Amino acid sequence: MSSTVKAANWRFVEVGRVVLVDNKELATIVEIIDQKRVLIDGPKIQRQAIALAKIVLTPIVLPNLPRGSRTATVTKKWAAADIDAKWAASGWAKKLANKERRSQLSDFERFQVMVLKKQRRFATKKALVKA
């Protein structure tokens, strides 16, 4: 009997880590202030100190970002690393966009979604009966 020990895939709080603020805006960690706060900056968000409890770490890291980088440096490196495209391609971003789209549906559009789901369910049941 053998067992394999696999290391956990942690998201470390590190300079250059891209974070999600309020499930909306992306920013990157520029400086670690203390155990509970970091300094963040990004193209769509103002440079600010924020508690780690109010952000979510993403798997994306901005490579070779110096500690305490200024806004211009962060913006240049952000564009060079194409962070927005990486985020848009991630499943997490797609899920958030889908959630936002669903919340914007009108009553009739929700009805149409329900009808389409019923049709899809019926088609799968019909295929299972034939098999």
Swiss-Prot record:
User: Might you name a Gene Ontology BP term for this protein?
Assistant: translation
Give one GO term, molecular function aspect: RNA binding
Q: Where in the cell is it found?
A: Cytoplasm
Which InterPro entries does the entry mention?
A: Rib_uL2_dom2, Ribosomal_eL14, Ribosomal_eL14_dom, Translation_prot_SH3-like_sf
Q: Is the keyword Transmembrane in the record? A: no
The organism's superkingdom is given as Eukaryota
Identify the keywords attached in UniProt to this record, alphabetized. Cytoplasm, Ribonucleoprotein, Ribosomal protein
One Gene Ontology cellular component: hyphal cell wall
What the protein does comes down to: Component of the ribosome, a large ribonucleoprotein complex responsible for the synthesis of proteins in the cell. The small ribosomal subunit (SSU) binds messenger RNAs (mRNAs) and translates the encoded message by selecting cognate aminoacyl-transfer RNA (tRNA) molecules. The large subunit (LSU) contains the ribosomal catalytic site termed the peptidyl transferase center (PTC), which catalyzes the formation of peptide bonds, thereby polymerizing the amino acids delivered by tRNAs into a polypeptide chain.
Q: Which family does it belong to?
A: Belongs to the eukaryotic ribosomal protein eL14 family.
Q: How does it assemble?
A: Component of the large ribosomal subunit. Mature ribosomes consist of a small (40S) and a large (60S) subunit. The 40S subunit contains about 32 different proteins and 1 molecule of RNA (18S). The 60S subunit contains 45 different proteins and 3 molecules of RNA (25S, 5.8S and 5S).
Q: Which PANTHER family match?
A: 60S RIBOSOMAL PROTEIN L14, LARGE RIBOSOMAL SUBUNIT PROTEIN EL14
Put simply, this protein is called Large ribosomal subunit protein eL14
Q: Which organism is it from?
A: Candida albicans (strain SC5314 / ATCC MYA-2876) (Yeast)
Q: State the organism's lineage.
A: Eukaryota, Fungi, Dikarya, Ascomycota, Saccharomycotina
Identify the coding gene.
RPL14
